[in-house]
C-alpha cells in the first residue's frame, strides 16, 4: 500500500515521502460506547467526530417513541434532522485531536447535555444551526485530511491529520 501511495504521490506532485511513513506512529484509542434502546453502540472516539455525532443523535432520539410517528412521517424525519443538527454541533465545536485538545467527551454525551438538547427541539419548526448552543466556544482549524485503507487481507489503517 505504501509503495502505491508513494508512486501516486510522485506521479502527481504529491508531498508524502518514504520518511513520512517511517516516522508515522499509529495511535489507537478506546471506542466510545453508549446504549440505544437496549443495544450497545460502539463507535470511534476522537479525533474522529462521527462517533460523537452518532451517539449524541441516538441519545436524543432515545427520548422519543419514533414508532408513534411512523417510519416515513414528517415528525420522524424532523426529529432525526434535529438530533443530527445537535450531534454535528457537538462535533464541530468540540472535537479535535485529543493529543492537542482537551475534549469534554463525558460532558458532550452526558444526560444533562442530552436533556438540554431535547428541550430545545420544537415540533413546529426547524432550529437554525446558529441557535444550537455549543458547550463552550473553541476555534477549529479548517485544515484536516483523512484517509482509510483496507487491503485484501483485511488489514486496515485510518489516518486523520
Sequence positions of predicted segments:
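Extended, domain-scale alpha-helical bundle/helix-rich regions
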Residues: 49-56, 86
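Short, conserved micro-motifs enriched in small and acidic residues
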Residues: 44-52, 74, 144
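Accessory "access/gating" subregions that flank catalytic or transport cores
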Residues: 1-46, 122-129, 133-139, 147-155
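Composition- and surface-driven signal marking solvent-exposed, interaction-prone regions
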Residues: 7, 20-22, 56, 70-73, ...
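Internal maturation/activation junctions in enzymes
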Residues: 14, 63-161
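Short glycine/serine- and small hydrophobic-enriched flexible loop segments
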Residues: 56-63
